[in-house]
């Protein structure tokens, strides 16, 4: 059963020598305990100094558990962030680039002209009957000088 009032203090060097997978980790996990716990022997924090009336209030300073490493540890990036260039195939044939610009073609302009029927029937008067205009396409080319 876990007793919340007492926290066991295990030296860092014991953990690092006992479990080699923790040997490369310079920052071990610290137990969750209150700083004001009367049963904790202050392994991680310095005790406060007596305060004079006009002096500044000192802050608690974190003490290092082990000697800091001389070389800063470099994290390896996750493989999903690495940019791997695609492999080039030597047997691949080169496809020539085709010019897709179209040549000049004559422009078709639709024109509308009314068509007049001149058919005269016996019952109708001699008026001209105009039907609805029909669209026809006429090819227009520029004159050559």
Curated annotation (Swiss-Prot):
Tissue spec. comment: Mammary gland specific. Secreted in milk.
Pfam families assigned: Casein_kappa (PF00997)
Phosphoserine: modified positions: 125, 142
Protein's UniProt name: Kappa-casein
Family: Belongs to the kappa-casein family.
PANTHER family hit by this protein: KAPPA CASEIN, KAPPA-CASEIN
A GO BP annotation: lactation
Coiled-coil residue windows: none
Cellular component GO terms held in the UniProt record: extracellular space
Gene: CSN3
Top-level lineage group: Eukaryota
Statement: the UniProt record of this protein carries the keyword Secreted: yes
Lineage of the organism: Eukaryota, Metazoa, Chordata, Craniata, Vertebrata
UniProt entry keywords in alphabetical sequence: Glycoprotein, Milk protein, Phosphoprotein, Secreted
């Amino acid at each position: 059963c876990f007793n919340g009032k007492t926290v066991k203090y295990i030296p860092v060097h014991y953990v690092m020598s006992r479990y080699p997978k923790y040997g490369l980790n310079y920052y071990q996990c610290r137990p969750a305990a209150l700083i004001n716990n009367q049963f904790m022997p202050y392994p991680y924090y310095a005790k406060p100094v007596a305060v004079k009336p006009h002096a500044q209030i000192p802050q608690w300073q974190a003490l290092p558990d082990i000697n800091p490493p001389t070389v800063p540890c470099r994290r390896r990036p996750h493989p999903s962030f690495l940019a791997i260039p695609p492999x080039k195939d030597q047997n691949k044939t080169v496809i020539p680039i085709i010019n897709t610009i179209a040549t000049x073609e004559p422009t078709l302009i639709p024109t509308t002209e009314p068509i007049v029927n001149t058919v005269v029937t016996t019952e109708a008067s001699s008026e001209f009957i105009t039907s609805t205009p029909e669209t026809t396409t006429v090819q227009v080319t520029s004159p050559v000088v």
